[in-house]
Design a protein with these regions (language model features):
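C-terminal alpha-helix
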Residues: 143-151
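N-terminal strand-loop-strand
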Residues: 2-43
Length: 153
């Protein structure tokens, strides 16, 4: 009987739930990924660079994809999933962090990022579970909401 080796490429990414208070409510920076239908909202995230720490990746990707700078508050957790890319199965781990807005104007991003991001918008954190397209990201937003309810920021 032949023996087959099942191998899977692994990817490690990091992203952020970047929050701020506007008019008395917590809002988060959401992106509409390039090429997706209107109404598909996601969190900024991307591959961890060689020698880069996941928290630094979350801050960098948030700035690249939204135009804002933030500070790291806490790690929210990891999501894991498998997807297929060009016929190859990929096991992906995405570490998410709670980030606090510090400066910048949402949506002011470099022209080359327009391929990846069609739009960035502040959306109510309370509504994140209804607005975000991906289940794991909804869970991270729920953790962010629980954190801001239980802690003084």
């Amino acid at each position: 009987m032949p023996c087959y080796k099942l191998s899977m490429r692994r990817e490690f990414s990091a992203g952020g739930v970047a929050i701020r208070r506007l008019r008395g409510e917590w809002v988060f920076a959401a992106i509409r990924p390039g090429g997706k239908e209107p109404g598909v909202w996601a969190l900024p995230k991307g591959l961890i660079g060689e020698g880069e720490k996941p928290g630094a990746t979350a801050l960098r990707e948030t700035e690249e994809e939204t135009g804002i700078q933030a500070t790291l508050v806490t790690k929210l957790g990891d999501i894991r999933y498998v997807y297929t890319w060009e016929g190859e199965r990929v096991f992906k781990v995405v570490s998410f962090y709670l980030l606090r807005y510090s400066k910048g104007r949402l949506g002011e991003i470099e022209p080359e990022m327009r391929i990846e991001v069609d739009e960035a918008r502040w959306l109510p954190l309370e509504e994140a579970p209804k607005l975000l397209a991906y289940g794991g990201e909804r869970q991270m937003a729920e953790k962010a909401l629980a954190f801001v309810r239980d802690n003084v920021l």
